[in-house]
Amino acid sequence: MKNISFKVNDFQYTINNKLTLIQACLKNKVDISRFCFHEKLSIAGNCRMCLVEDLKQVKPLASCAINVSNSMNIYTNTLKVKKARESVLEFLLANHPLDCPICDQGGECDLQDQSVVFGSDRGRFYEFKRSVEDKDCGPLIKTIMNRCIHCTRCVRFSNEVAGVNILGVTGRGSKMEIGFYIENLMRSELSGNVIDLCPVGALTSKPFAFTSRPWELKSYNSIDVLDSLHSNIRVDIRGTKIMRILPRVNSELNEDWITDKIRFSYDSFRRQRLYDPMVKISGSFLKIGWKKAMLFIKKFFCNFLGFNHSSFIPLRGYIGDYLDLETIYTFKKFLLLNGSNFFLPSSSYNDLTALYSFNTPLTRLDEGDFCILLDVNLRVELPIVNSRIKQLVSKKMLPVFVLGFYSNFNYFVKHISNSSKTLLHVLEGSHWLSAKISKKFSSKPIFLIGDSSSLLKGSLIVPLFNFTNVICDNWNGLNIISNDSSYLSTKEFNLSSSHSQNSHLLNFPINFVLNYDKAVLVDSSAFQIYQGHHGDTNAINSNLIFPSTSFIEKNSFYSNSLAIVQKTKKILFSPGNSRDDWKILNALIDNFGFSYFKVRNSFDLVSFLSESTPFILYKRSFSFKCFGFYEQLVYHFFNYFSVNNNYYIYDSITRNSKIMSLCFNKFKMKGYNFF
């Protein structure tokens, strides 16, 4: 790859010749004003705000559309450039409304900022300003199309990243406008990102409208635990209230995007929260303090042991989503100290991390030459990864085949079958797809597999590794997809986040439900303890409730599906008398007199964690192990069924979000089943 030298403002730079001029300047910290250009979108060249002067050219050049050439001499701050930008701004402002004081983009508006620097002090436009009808994009995006400057960022994002080809440009001249070709809604799980992309106030957040100004907000960095990727986010608060959630750039994970679920579900952190420990007496809940709650549970356990003449407590745990590593580790210790044995059977291959993690770095997905989706609805479970696959299909014509339930994909796929028996035929070489994924024809295949797939039970693991190059030198294309944010963490500690594999233990007399929001099928006579942050069905059916904090109210470590450990920050104070999950469990351990597990603060707990799980301190390198020593199990054939299609209302957080409920009802009313 050839490097060339060029000059910008009389400073010499060396850069790759495949870059455009604006990309080369941005890489070398030379700022060039722009509206339509964005690093993650294709080049449009609409706004002409990025004009620069080349001494070899008569007219200014659009730096976003010109590749760097050798010995190029560019100036970005000459009088000619400034006059050109002033003229461009004059045309943009000619039809722009003068409603800046009531615009939600105020303080973050690129048009305002660049008008101050490059704009004129007067206007020469005396005609009527044009008027454009606002579009209905749904309950998330507010449109005021009079402010639109036709940068087409939203159009390119919807087509190239979100994969919904519903936005476009119609008309010419003064009648040109951006909108839907037919009346439609922005039906994408990434639609909120157009709010960040819009350089003016044409597209703004509808829930955030008229609530606060950017300079009134305090910003904190955190992560999105509502899916297993853990995208990087920025949480803006005012006082004790979350006002909005925005993305943070992370090229290894979410790039510049986040999902609508984390962006708009922030209102749920103030609704249906559990504030105090409660005990159920005669069918009604009574508030009690933490001391009384600990005394109650200790007395109950002592009475149970004495009545049943038992030396251990038959306690069964249910582990839910959104649990941090400290909580999972402490919960495992709590179960062990009470004599419980709630671990996965060895047939699930829990001793190999590669069999329950996302092994291919997202930055290397473009190296894949083939992709198979097995029993997974990628658009619902990991929308960011789905967006990356969509871009590979568009740019590299990546072939994608689906084995499992067919959902509404936003890119071209070939659906093979609903039966798991077809996968066996493929791996045996008797199917037409066998030739395409064999070691001879595919050097770097990508397998995206749902966590409920039969493949994970071991029956087809060995044929997969023997027939394909899914794991070879310098490549691991085996990727497990899960809706559960703490899926990998529970596997690392050899715990199950699902009760289905232990259905024969339904008659346990005591159940401990740890932030588990799915239905718990237990005997009505069983004593149930619920620990969580939102009041849900399992809380109502419990005998004792411990209120805990959510991820925005504590400093905790979380591991995503790629085994990348990140930390959340305590942004808000915990409501009422709620406590961190691990602190509640640690208090229970102390309450039962287990003195040999002493944890007094988070630093002690991190020390325990680093000893038991090395990937806490050291980023896990991807190992390419030999799986040949595993015995092949008996085949079990069945048809794949649809996984959860309700993207907006899935868990205790989104179920308590008014905004998510509006989204669900709006799309349901319109009859959209786009997942």
From Swiss-Prot:
Domain 4Fe-4S His(Cys)3-ligated-type: 80-119
Required cofactor(s): [2Fe-2S] cluster; [4Fe-4S] cluster
Residues that hold [4Fe-4S] cluster 1 according to the record: 96, 100, 103, 109
Top-rank EC class of the record's enzyme: translocase
Subcellular location: Mitochondrion inner membrane
GO BP term, pick one: ATP synthesis coupled electron transport
Key words of the record: 2Fe-2S, 4Fe-4S, Electron transport, Iron, Iron-sulfur, Membrane, Metal-binding, Mitochondrion, Mitochondrion inner membrane, NAD, Oxidoreductase, Respiratory chain, Translocase, Transport, Ubiquinone
Gene3D superfamilies: 3.10.20.740, 3.30.70.20, 3.40.50.740
GO molecular function: 2 iron, 2 sulfur cluster binding; 4 iron, 4 sulfur cluster binding; metal ion binding; NADH dehydrogenase (ubiquinone) activity
SMART domains recorded: NADH-G_4Fe-4S_3
Main subcellular location: mitochondrion
Binding of [4Fe-4S] cluster 2, residues: 148, 151, 154, 198
Reactions catalysed according to its record: a ubiquinone + NADH + 5 H(+)(in) = a ubiquinol + NAD(+) + 4 H(+)(out)
Textual note on the cofactor: Binds 1 [2Fe-2S] cluster per subunit.
This protein's GO CC annotations: mitochondrial inner membrane
Domain 2Fe-2S ferredoxin-type, chain residue ranges per copy: 2-80
Protein family (similarity comment): Belongs to the complex I 75 kDa subunit family.
Known partners and oligomeric status: Complex I is composed of about 30 different subunits.
Function comment: Core subunit of the mitochondrial membrane respiratory chain NADH dehydrogenase (Complex I) that is believed to belong to the minimal assembly required for catalysis. Complex I functions in the transfer of electrons from NADH to the respiratory chain. The immediate electron acceptor for the enzyme is believed to be ubiquinone. This is the largest subunit of complex I and it is a component of the iron-sulfur (IP) fragment of the enzyme. It may form part of the active site crevice where NADH is oxidized.
Protein name: NADH-ubiquinone oxidoreductase 75 kDa subunit
